[in-house]
Curated annotation (Swiss-Prot):
Keywords: Amino-acid biosynthesis, ATP-binding, Cytoplasm, Glycosyltransferase, Histidine biosynthesis, Nucleotide-binding, Transferase
Pathway(s) the chain acts in: Amino-acid biosynthesis; L-histidine biosynthesis; L-histidine from 5-phospho-alpha-D-ribose 1-diphosphate: step 1/9
Highest taxon of source: Bacteria
Gene expressing this chain: hisG
EC annotation from Swiss-Prot or TrEMBL: 2.4.2.17
Molecular function via GO: ATP binding; ATP phosphoribosyltransferase activity
Pfam families per the UniProt record, alphabetical: HisG (PF01634)
Top-rank EC class of the record's enzyme: transferase
Primary subcellular site in the record, as a coarse category: cytoplasm
GO terms for cellular component: cytoplasm
Protein's name according to its UniProt entry: ATP phosphoribosyltransferase
Catalysed transformations (reactions): 1-(5-phospho-beta-D-ribosyl)-ATP + diphosphate = 5-phospho-alpha-D-ribose 1-diphosphate + ATP
Listed SUPFAM superfamilies: Periplasmic binding protein-like II
Entry comment, domain topic: Lacks the C-terminal regulatory region which is replaced by HisZ.
C-alpha cells in the first residue's frame, strides 16, 4: 500500500491532475467527503487528508510514504527523515518580510511576528540582527498596525492583503512552491515503485509547464 499525504485547498487542487497523469484518482471528491482516508482508482494507493503543516510529520514518521508540502512548511519543519525529489511547480508564492508603508527601519532590537518561527530565527541570525520573534497563527498584517511588531514574515501571493492593510513587502526570504516529499525508509523498501511515480509526476509537471 502506498499512502500519499495531501492538504485541502490550493495544493490539493493542483496536485490531483498530476496524480491523475499517473493513473491515481480519488474515488470520492476530497473537498466534499468527510473521510480523511480516501481510496483511489488504484487499489493499493490511498490519500490521507491532513493539515498542511502536518504533512511532513506524517511522511517523516512513516504514516505516509509520500506527501506534497509547500517549501515554506518544509523550511519551518526542518525534518531529517525526508527526501525532496521533485519541485511540482504548483502553489507558487513568496516568503517575505513586510512592514508599514514608509516606516523607517527600526534601530536596535527588532520585533517580528510570524508563524514561521524557525525560518525567522535562521534568517535574522544570518544577518546578525537581534530580534524578538512573536508567534502568531493568523492575521499577521494586524501586528505592525497595533504596535505588536515592527515587521512580519509571511507568505505573499499578490500582495493585495498587505496593501489593503497599509503594509508593503520588503525582503524576499525564499521563492515558494510545493514539493513532493518521500519517507526515506519507504524509498528503500518500495524504491522501484516510488521512483516510477516520481518520474511520471516529473513528466506531468514538465508537460503542464510547457503547456
Amino acid at each position: 500500500m502506498l499512502t500519499i499525504a495531501l492538504s485541502k485547498g490550493r495544493i490539493l487542487d493542483d496536485t490531483l491532475p498530476l496524480l491523475a497523469a499517473a493513473g491515481i484518482e480519488p474515488t470520492e471528491n476530497p473537498d466534499k467527503s468527510r473521510k480523511l482516508i480516501i481510496p483511489t482508482t488504484q487499489d493499493d494507493v490511498r490519500l490521507l487528508i491532513v493539515r498542511a503543516t502536518d504533512v511532513p510529520t506524517y511522511v517523516e514518521h512513516g504514516a505516509a510514504d509520500l506527501g506534497v508540502a509547500g517549501k515554506d512548511v518544509l523550511m519551518e519543519y526542518g525534518g531529517q527523515g525526508l527526501y525532496e525529489p521533485l519541485d511540482l511547480q504548483i502553489a507558487k508564492c513568496k516568503l517575505m518580510t513586510a512592514g508599514k508603508v514608509g516606516a523607517p527601519e527600526p534601530k536596535g532590537r527588532l520585533r517580528v511576528a510570524t508563524k514561521f518561527v524557525n525560518v525567522a530565527k535562521r534568517y535574522y541570525a544570518e544577518q546578525g540582527r537581534q530580534v524578538d520573534i512573536i508567534k502568531l497563527y493568523g492575521s499577521m498584517e494586524l501586528a505592525p498596525l497595533v504596535g505588536l511588531a515592527d515587521k512580519i514574515i509571511d507568505v505573499v501571493d499578490t500582495g493585495n492583503t498587505l496593501r489593503a492593510n497599509g503594509l508593503e513587502p520588503q525582503e524576499l526570504i525564499a521563492t515558494i512552491s510545493s514539493r513532493l516529499i518521500v519517507n526515506k525508509a519507504s524509498m528503500k523498501m518500495q524504491h522501484g515503485r516510488i521512483q516510477a511515480l516520481i518520474e511520471t509526476l516529473r513528466g506531468a509537471v514538465e508537460a503542464r509547464h510547457q503547456g
